[in-house]
């Protein structure tokens, strides 16, 4: 399995595959932008904070709208720096 492909299990025990399309740092914390691989029609990526526990790295859902907005702002800056299109009305496809 490729290093940037991970499996996540939701609260219902359903396992899904995601590709880590980008990791970034915002306000001293690290975040992962994930795109679902199981749903080929999916247009929205998911954002998780990367944290660590005794077993290694874990992904934590964002806890607030403020944290989400901070990560989206950093993501937007990275995309603009890379010369990629940004459509504020579509929130960059991030969820």
From Swiss-Prot:
<dbReference type="Pfam" id="PF06949">
    <property type="entry name" value="DUF1292"/>
</dbReference>
<comment type="similarity">
    <text>Belongs to the UPF0473 family.</text>
</comment>
<protein>
    <recommendedName>
        <fullName>UPF0473 protein CD630_12860</fullName>
    </recommendedName>
</protein>
<dbReference type="InterPro" id="IPR009711">
    <property type="entry name" value="UPF0473"/>
</dbReference>
């Amino acid at each position: 399995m490729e290093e940037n492909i991970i499996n996540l299990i939701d609260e219902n025990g359903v396992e899904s595959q995601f590709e880590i399309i980008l990791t970034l740092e915002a306000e001293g914390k690290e975040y992962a932008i994930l795109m679902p691989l199981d749903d080929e029609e999916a247009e929205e990526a998911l954002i998780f904070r990367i944290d660590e526990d005794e077993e290694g790295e874990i992904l934590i859902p964002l806890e607030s709208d403020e944290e989400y907005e901070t990560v989206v702002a950093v993501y937007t800056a990275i995309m603009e720096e890379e010369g990629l299109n940004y459509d504020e009305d579509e929130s960059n496809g991030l969820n």
